[in-house]
Amino acid sequence: MTDLRTRFEQEALPHLDAAYNLARWLTRSDTEAEDIVQDALLLAFRNFDRQRGPSTKAWLLAIVRNAFLSSVRRSGPRARVSDPIEAMGEADTPPALVSSADPERDAIAADSARSLNEALGKLPQDFREVLVLRELEGLSYREIAGVTATPIGTVMSRLARARESFKAHWLRANRGSDDGLS
């Protein structure tokens, strides 16, 4: 048991931030994300001796995703937040973005973070999920296919559509500003 625990701590726990990030983007709630990650980590630890794939990160994120889907099935459809930014508190802005010695840079970074959160929050769950896994967590297409239990071609098409949709939301939110995408 001690060897398994040590292996789990060395191989799975370094991906705790990625697990939380995915849960946060799926649930749009800090509290729900924490609950999902707690459930997922318990399940992951109980089944860690069966983990055979090359990527512990992808395996753990698949468990997080499945824990989220199980939670949705148990509690039924959740009320959607009309404005994802309203649902987010100041804790959602990374401290590094708001703590430099340059207040102007801090304001621009905080505004960019809000725009990013808003654009991602407006994407359908399937698009948001693959975009977060690829662009924020750095998973390969194959790993994303494993996490989402979808064919790699579906991952690629969802990712392409997610990028288009994200860009459209980003440009609408930043119309007239100098920091939009080109």
Model-derived segments and spans:
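A short, charge-rich alpha-helical start-of-domain segment used by transcription regulators
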Residues: 1-21, 31-34
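Sigma70-family region 2
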Residues: 39-56, 74-76
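Short, Lys/Arg-enriched C-terminal cap helix and immediately downstream tail that follows
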Residues: 73, 163-182
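Internal acidic/polar
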Residues: 70, 79-109, 113, 140, ...
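A short pre-motif secondary-structure segment
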Residues: 130-134
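Conserved RNAP core-binding helix
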Residues: 30-47, 152
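DNA-recognition helix of helix-turn-helix
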Residues: 142, 148-172
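Arg/Lys-rich amphipathic alpha helix in sigma70-family domain 2
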Residues: 62-84, 109, 168, 172
